[in-house]
Every structure is written in structure tokens, then in C-alpha cells.
Amino acid sequence: MRPADNPFRTERIDRIQYRLTGGAALDDLAERFAGLGGRAAIIGHHGAGKSRLLATLADHLETRGRPSLRIRCGRDPLPSLEELAGRLLVADELDHLSRRRRRRLLARAGRAGGMLAAVHQIPRDLPLLHHCTVDISLVAGLVCDLTGAPPPPDLARLLGDHAGNVRALFRHLYDRAADRTP
């Protein structure tokens, strides 16, 4: 299969919107975020959708008049108070910062427009907004949407083999699709 035809190619995966479960909606999360004082964390294991939800919710908040500054901790420099003025700090991979740098960033965000962060474990310094979880029905739905076909019969085993990491599972399915000849 040509890479451009692979249903698991990056450009297709990047267009997937995070799917809230249990009847929740982005408006519900936005209201809860406001109720937490505009400071909260999204948690989940590797490949559970934290970064996707972080970006989706930040986009949603921007449409509601909440401008943001987005950083990937450990890669991007820490923003100054001037850069943060009136903006929500959206920090992906917050747990990549040392304790000292994290405290400094939280203090700046607290004096600016708040903070929305993605982390792997429940933080002591931010309230929990949402816990990203993965289950087979969610992943099966994503695979069906990407391929237009039923998921492979071994999907549950593959998800387990990848410890629930959907990103790693999609890389595996990309390789599997690439190995098929037309």
C-alpha cells in the first residue's frame, strides 16, 4: 500500500477529534474548567489522548474568547509574564519540567490567564479536570472511522500488546497496512 493511501497515516490520525465518553461534551469540560478557577490538569497514560484533548479543549476555549499560549514542556522555553498576559497557558507534558521550573511556570500562569496542562499522574499543584482512558470500544470506533471497515479481529490483543497506547497501536496498524499488497 502506498503511504498516501494508508488509513493510519499521520495526517489522518491528526484529524481525529478526542472523544469524550459518558455523554460529556466540550462545553461541560469548559464549564468545569471555569469552576476550577481556570487551572486544571488532564491526566492519562502514554497514548491515551491527553495531548489531543488538550489541543481540542484549548481550541474550544479560544472560540469562547479565551486566547491561549501553547507550549510543550521540556522543548519550548518557559513563557514570560508579558507573553502570558491575558492568555491561558496550555502546557503539554508538564511533568517533563523539574519541580523548580514547574513551580515557576505555575506561578506565572496564576498571575496571567490560568493554566491547562497534560500530565501522566494526578498533580499535587493542579486540580484534575479529566482522566483520559482507553477501552476497546473506543479504539474499535476510531479504527472503523479511519478504515471504513470493521476493526481487525485481533484488535483487543493488539491494544493490550501496546499497553493501551493508541498512538503506538496506530503505528502498528500503519505498518500492517503498509505490508499489504494491493
Question: How does the language model describe each region?
Answer:
Residues 1-36, 175-182:
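A short, basic N-terminal segment
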